[in-house]
Regions:
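Hydrophobic, well-ordered secondary-structure segments
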Residues: 13-20, 24, 44-47, 55-58, ...
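Short loop segments at secondary-structure junctions
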Residues: 3-6, 55, 80-83
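Short beta-strand element of the conserved SAM-dependent methyltransferase core
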Residues: 1-2, 50-52, 76
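Contiguous, small/hydrophobic- and glycine-enriched helical/loop subdomains that border
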Residues: 1-40
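Long, positively charged amphipathic alpha-helical accessory segments at protein N-termini or as interdomain linkers
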Residues: 30-32, 64, 68-158
């Protein structure tokens, strides 16, 4: 969510709150016991984590502020929670940080068979209740560039 803001620092907490609640509502619409709040043992802990039943982290939220604009981004794990755990276990071990792999989940773990398109539709619906949503299609050149670079960022799948 990107919004024009005259004084970006003043609305930081409110933006975190509204986006976290919006994501939780979108997931609740799909049948997830979605809540906002830190999960014990979660990776990258934060009070605006969107979780399932207070047990597992599903989404993290961050903000980027520049003069005149605020961007609130959400990383939501929809499928393949085991891949997230496989990547994070060695990272947290190397860093010497505490983390409970059981605290990491995905929407699919809560609603078996859920499809990405269903999650996208629910989030877009909830966004449209509070914001003017303007879908933007990426150009074929941008999509090609992303696809060709993706291999550098993918974790190996065993």
């Amino acid at each position: 969510v990107a919004t024009p803001e005259e004084q970006v620092a003043r609305g930081t907490g409110g933006r975190f709150d509204s986006v976290a609640e919006m994501i939780a509502a979108a997931l609740a619409d799909l049948g997830v016991d979605a809540r906002v709040g830190e999960v014990p043992g979660e990776y990258c802990p934060g009070s605006h984590t969107v979780n399932a039943g207070g047990r597992v982290k599903l989404a993290g939220i961050a903000q980027r502020l520049i003069k005149g604009c605020a961007h609130v981004g959400v990383i939501l794990v929809v499928k393949d929670s085991e891949l997230v755990r496989e990547v994070l276990v060695p990272v947290y071990e190397t860093l010497g940080l505490e983390w409970d792999p059981a605290s990491s989940g995905a929407v699919e773990d809560e609603v078996p068979g859920i499809e990405l398109k269903d999650v996208e539709a629910s989030i877009l619906h909830r966004l449209s209740l509070n914001y003017e949503v303007e879908p933007v299609a990426l150009s074929p050149a941008t999509l090609d560039a992303a696809e060709s670079a993706a291999g550098r960022f993918r974790s190996p799948v065993p």
